[in-house]
């Protein structure tokens, strides 16, 4: 069953401006080490960071909190499954919120799609509650 859905659309130029104005302070405040490693050496660095920013916003919406109630930027990070598909890794307040909204006997599957077409980046997140016997391992 779907227990959360969120989407976000961001102007990549907004992230470009933040990167230029605030540099590493911005990057370290918002992005996990894994996200930084994936984005830093990309030719389209700002687009890579913008997609991850949109994913965090979409995930926070899917959790039902937005970036509030103890859910912080670095509590949510875009990671890739062995197949290469993106998903979200949650820690801290985001993980606590996920555990709170999961029905007993269920595990979460977080589905994420991210895309960009300059000047926009977009993300959709669906949080699915699967019975433990069906949950991916």
UniProtKB/Swiss-Prot annotation:
InterPro entries, alphabetized: 4-PPantetheinyl_Trfase_dom, 4-PPantetheinyl_Trfase_dom_sf, ACPS, Ppantetheine-prot_Trfase_dom
GO BP annotations listed: fatty acid biosynthetic process
Leading EC class: transferase
EC number of the protein: 2.7.8.7
Catalysis performed (reactions): apo-[ACP] + CoA = holo-[ACP] + adenosine 3',5'-bisphosphate + H(+)
Keywords linked to the UniProt accession: Cytoplasm, Fatty acid biosynthesis, Fatty acid metabolism, Lipid biosynthesis, Lipid metabolism, Magnesium, Metal-binding, Transferase
GO cellular component terms, semicolon-separated: cytoplasm
Cofactor(s) the record lists: Mg(2+)
Compartment(s) where it occurs, according to its Swiss-Prot or TrEMBL record: Cytoplasm
A GO MF term: holo-[acyl-carrier-protein] synthase activity
Taxonomic superkingdom: Bacteria
Binding positions (Mg(2+)): 8, 57
Role description: Transfers the 4'-phosphopantetheine moiety from coenzyme A to a Ser of acyl-carrier-protein.
Family: Belongs to the P-Pant transferase superfamily. AcpS family.
Protein name from the UniProt record: Holo-[acyl-carrier-protein] synthase
């Amino acid at each position: 069953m779907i227990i959360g859905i969120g989407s976000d659309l961001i102007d990549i130029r907004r992230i470009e401006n933040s990167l230029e104005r605030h540099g590493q302070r911005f990057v370290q405040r918002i992005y996990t080490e894994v996200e930084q490693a994936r984005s830093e050496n990309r030719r389209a660095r700002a687009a890579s960071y913008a997609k991850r920013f949109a994913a965090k916003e979409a995930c926070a919406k899917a959790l039902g909190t937005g970036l509030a109630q103890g859910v912080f930027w670095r509590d949510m990070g875009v990671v890739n499954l062995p197949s290469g598909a993106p998903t979200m890794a949650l820690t801290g307040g985001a993980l606590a919120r996920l555990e709170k909204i999961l029905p007993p006997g269920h595990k979460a599957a977080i589905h994420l799609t991210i895309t960009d077409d300059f000047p926009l980046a977009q993300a959709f997140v669906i949080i699915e509650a699967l019975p433990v016997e069906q949950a991916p391992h």
